[in-house]
Amino acid sequence: MSAEMTDLNFAEGRPLMGEKEDDITVLLQEYVTQEHDIETAHGIVHVTMCGTPKLNRPVILTYHDIGLNHKTCFNSLFNFEDMHEITQHFSVCHVDAPGQQEGAASFPAGYMYPSMDQLAEMLPGVVQQLGLKSIIGLGIGSGAYILTRFALNHPSMVEGLVLININPCAEGWMDWAATKISGWAHALPEMVISHLFSKDEVHSNPELVETYRQHILHDINQNNLQLFVKSYNSRRDLEIERPIPGSNTVTLKCPSLLVVGDSSPAVDAVVECNSKLDPTKTTLLKMSDCGGFPQVVQPAKLAEAFKYFVQGMGYMPAASMTRLMRSRTGSAASSSSQDGNRSRSHTNEGSRSRSQTGDGNRSRAHTGDGNRSRSHTDTNNVNSDHNTPKSMEVSC
C-alpha cells in the first residue's frame, strides 16, 4: 500500500472544473453545500446537501457505517477525479446517523437511540422536506442495511441502490457472544475496527487502520457511537427472498449493485444477500486487492462501476468509460451466484470484467430526461441458456 493511500482528506469535496468553458457551462451547475438538521418522527437527523437537485433525476443519498460519518466514509470517493463527472450530473445528499456528525453533542442520559428500522423511517422525511424527486442510495455496512430497509418500505422513493458490505441478517447468537467477549476485553474503537477491517487488513495495511482508529477515538462522540453500535447489533433480519414467479416474496424492486472486497469481513454476508435478491436486477461486484473500504482503497474501480450502474438505469448515456472499457476484450469474469455459493475467485487487473452494462450484449439506447427507461442491465441475456435466471457476478 502506497503512502498516498493513507493520506486521507476529510474536507468537503468540490467537482474539478473542466478544461473548457463550454464543458463547464453545459455540465456544471452551481455547486452549493448546505447543512440541515431535519426533524423526523424518530428524532433529528443531520444531512449535508451538495449541489442543487434537478427535477428530472434522482439525488445520490449516502449513508455511512458505524464508527464513521459522511466525510470520513465517502469523501475519499467523492474527491476522486473520476467521480466528478457523476457529481456534475447528480446532486448528493449525505446523511449522518443521529449523533455521529462532526461536533455532535452527547445525547442526554436515558436517551433511546432509534432502532435500525426507525433510522430507515427517518429517510422519507429527509426526502420530502428537501423536495427530492427520488434517490439512488449509496451505503456501506450499517448504512447499506438502513438504505435497504428504506427501499423495502418505500420502493417508490428509491430508483437504485449501491450497497457495500451489506449484511441482510440479524446478528446471530455466536456474533452476539463474540461482541460481548470483545466488549470485556477491548475498548469500543477496537470493536468497530474489527467490523470495518479484516484481520488480514489490520496486518497488511496498518497505516490505513490506524488512521481510522484515531478518527474513531478523537472525532466521533464515544457515547453516541456506543448507542449506534448497539442499535446495529440489535438489527432484525431483512427477511428478503429471491422472487419466484407467482409468489409474493419480499425483495428489492429497484436495480442493485452489491460491492465487496475480496478480503472484507463482510464477503460471506454480501454473497448471501446476493442469493436472496432478484437476479434480473442485481449485480455482485467483487474487488480484488481490497478489503472493507473499497471507496478508499479502490475508488477508481468503484467510480467506474457506479458510472455503469447509472447508465444501466438510463442516465449519463455519454459518460466516459476508461479502465473497464479498455478491458472489454478481456475474459468475462461473470459467473452465476447461487444459494450457499461462497466463491471468492477473482480475475487479475489485466482481465477486468464489465462491471455493470455487459458491453457486448447490452443496449445503451437512452431517451431524454423526461422519458428514461429505468430498467437495469439485462442480466437474463447473460445466462439465457439456463432455465432459471441468475444474477451477474463480476470480479475486478
Swiss-Prot record:
Which superkingdom does the taxonomy of this entry point to?
Eukaryota
What would be one Gene Ontology cellular-component term for the protein? cytoplasm
Biased-composition ranges for Low complexity? 327-340
Q: Name one GO biological process term.
A: pronephros development
InterPro entries with a match to the protein in the record: AB_hydrolase_fold, NDRG
Which key words are in the record?
Developmental protein, Repeat
Q: Please give the residue ranges the record annotates as the region Disordered.
A: 326-396
sequence repeats, residue ranges? 340-349, 350-359, 360-369, 370-379
Which residue intervals make up region (4 X 10 AA tandem repeats of G-[NS]-R-S-R-[AS]-[HQ]-T-[DGN]-[DET])?
340-379
Q: Does the keyword Hydrolase apply?
A: no
Polar residues composition bias: residue spans: 378-390
Q: Which SUPFAM superfamilies match?
A: alpha/beta-Hydrolases
> Compositionally biased, Basic and acidic residues: which spans?
366-377
Q: Name one Pfam family in it.
A: Ndr
Primary role: May be involved in pronephros development, after specification of the pronephros.
Q: Which family does it belong to?
A: Belongs to the NDRG family.
- The protein depicted here goes by the name Protein NDRG1-B
Q: Which organism is it from?
A: Xenopus laevis (African clawed frog)
Gene of this entry: ndrg1-b
